[in-house]
Amino acid sequence: YEKNPAKYVMAPANAIKRHVVVEKRFSDMAAWADSCPFNKTEYHDTKLGIICAGSTYVYSKEVFGDNASYLKIGLVNPLPDNLIRDFCSKVERVIVVEELDPIIETHVKAMGIKCDGKNLLPVLSEFSQEIIAKCVNGTEPKFVSLDEDIPVRPPVMCPGCPHRGLFFVLKKLGVTVSGDIGCYTLGSAPPLCAVDSTLCMGASISGLHGMNKCGGIDPKKSVAVIGDSTFAHSGVTGLMNMVYNKAVSTVIISDNSITGMTGHQQNPTTGKTLKGETTYQIKIEKICEAFGIKDVKIIDPNEIKLLEAGIKDSLGRDEVSVIIARRPCVLLKEVKKDKYFTVNSDKCRKCGACMKIGCPAISMTENGAVIDETLCTGCELCEKMCAFGCMEVKSR
């Protein structure tokens, strides 16, 4: 490394000079794009030419085969202008097959080349062979059909997930929930349906702050829900601003002791590095106290009565409150799963209370509720839901 402030310190005077370098570099790349090995042409039938990139090349090949010629673009920025002109001059009709926004199509048309694209193909969702064949040819491709329909598998929180009890209580209380990115985003799905908004990482707290200041939503009937790793990633500054700007709402930090959704990565609150080495553990409660938050509670979210009482207490305060709903992710290897529950069918009254938590291990039959013991983790939440003592614990 060599010190070069003129290159690396982007103060206005330096930025103006570096802008010239960037534009020259981009111009050089544009000239190279025409000979770039990532851009390939395949000529077959020249009545139709397909311009595509990525997976749409494979789909198009399966639909049109040798009945079309192809320009597969591997370098999409900058686009290979001369290669595009040369390809289009050798085919009678051009169709740009690209997913979502018509980036390549708009560029081709700006070059004065007539082509089809989004006038035939949808601007939404990802493509498939069926979509391309139907939109361009008006035909359905031939596929091997399955004798049985594949069952629907909607995304769902795992059996024993510590977020489940929290969202059950929030739904029961009827509060507005500003959500965030993580496993707990699934709190928006049936039967819980507790999350009202989710935008991006950290937006739960900032969004709640905005609700406080803009009005229209009672701050004492609204909460933010954010995970421990997301809080460390981009929630800390939002909470600090809530305190600074005298907001009045409750922030719930759902601490499952890991970064769950993306594959159990460590984070600053777990006490381990990404390599698994022991390191200093950032205490969420200490951060909250350092901001001057007086009401900081730590509650096990599976203790739904305590959690409900704690949320009600925090919502009644004229200040920022924090509840840390702390229970480790059930998929952590150190979490014991040495028991499971069954349903005593003689006691079951088919009231459906156990179904309200949305546990995938529980289903309802003509004879009452049934628990799949291979899925049950013994979290006890269903036992707390049942008013008739139907749930019976078994050892593994």
Indicate where each model-derived feature is located.
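Flexible, low-complexity linker and terminal segments
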Residues: 1-157, 162-166, 175, 179, ...
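Charged, low-complexity, helix/coiled-coil-prone segments
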Residues: 30-32, 146-157, 179-187, 221-234, ...
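Short, glycine/acidic-enriched loop or turn micro-motifs at the edges of active sites
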Residues: 101, 183, 231, 258, ...
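Thiamine diphosphate
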Residues: 188-324, 334-335
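Active-site diphosphate/adenylate-binding microenvironment
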Residues: 145-205, 214-217
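Anion (oxyanion) recognition and catalysis
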Residues: 89, 109, 171, 243, ...
